[in-house]
């Protein structure tokens, strides 16, 4: 069987805009109060072929966007613009939606509970490769079992209590 050459994926074409569009795009909510960082994360996520929701700058905005859009992945900072909490926003969201969670923060020690957590944490400053790897990992885990989702909710809940 002969396929049209434009439909054949090679290492050279794997990351072409056309091939990225053909992959299943997921909604990714960005919760970040610093506009430069939010834009950077948006560009990285978009480059992976996913749709960006947000950015949300406050806990209230994050909850509103997250509950309305029901994203597959949430990329969140810990401290937000009005002094509110990305951890609390994510914790509240996970009561209603099934989403993979990535925290990008300048204070990763706040997210250490001493236990193995099913939540990805990337310290600032980050590299493009770190964000890409985390989002790719989170989206590949999108078919996660309910057991893993419950573990993620429990982990974020523990972070909330620690805060």
Regions found by a protein language model. Give the residues of each.
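Acidic, metal-coordinating helix/loop segments flanking the phosphotransfer/catalytic sites
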Residues: 42, 55-73, 81
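A Lys-centered signature of the CheY-like receiver
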Residues: 124
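Conserved acidic carboxylate
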Residues: 32, 105
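Conserved phosphotransfer cores of two-component systems
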Residues: 67-69, 91-99, 114-116
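Non-catalytic signal-transmission and effector/linker regions of two-component phosphorelay proteins
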Residues: 1-27, 127-163
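Two-component/phosphorelay signaling modules centered on CheY-like receiver
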Residues: 34-54
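Conserved phosphotransfer microenvironments
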Residues: 76-92
